[in-house]
Amino acid sequence: MRRCLAVLASRHDASCAGLPDIAPVAPLAQAVRRAIRFDSAQAQVLIGQPGIARSDPDCFALTAGNYVLGGGGFVSRLMQEVREKRGLTYGISSTFSPALQAGPFAVALQTRPDQAAQALDVATGVIRDFVAQGPTPEELQAAKDNLIGGFPLRLDSNAKLLANVANIAWNGLPLDSLETWTDQIARLTADDVRAAFQRHLQPDRMVTVTVGAQP
């Protein structure tokens, strides 16, 4: 893998014109809410804000924390609060999509139009509480176990290996990124995760878009 990365770097043509710089993504100054009328049985709700670049050192803490918040399926807080306890949706998830620049953080759900406001209130409350308090040590350990245990599945084919090599090269990551990934996750503490979420998410300044029939 290191040889592949070295070859990619050696074949860079210095005479090739570089792409223009992209302006950094500006943080949101205030919350924005948009309701778009659309005749459908389900309302689509999206909550989000600018997130992080892939090179951000908080990427590992946010990855582990997001598993607890909304990336871990039925064990996540969003799924437990919005679906399991209240039956407001079949599914809800949160994602960070880091890129060269700050990619989005987003929470997505579908619900009946007459339940959209309640589902939104519950989801934003969960986000706010998680940013304020972070995960419990038990939640974080479960997330770490899942992420570390599933890591080999990200490398179990040539296509996946090549995709990881391309990701390292594209984002300018350290060449030993795959070798150290599980260690970076394993050493995280609940305080690390809480601090990272507080640095990067502003629950009271997110954009919310609801598309569907108005109740």
Regions found by a protein language model. Give the residues of each.
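PAPS/PAP-binding and catalytic site of the sulfotransferase fold
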Residues: 1-5, 123-124
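Non-catalytic beta-strand/loop surface segments
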Residues: 6-56, 70-117, 139, 183-205, ...
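Conserved NTP-handling cores and scaffolds of large molecular machines
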Residues: 8-12, 72, 86, 127-134, ...
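Divalent metal-coordination and catalytic microenvironments
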Residues: 47, 63, 82, 123, ...
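M16/insulysin-pitrilysin zinc metalloprotease superfamily fold
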Residues: 72, 97-154, 176
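C-terminal regions of mature proteins
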Residues: 109, 141-215
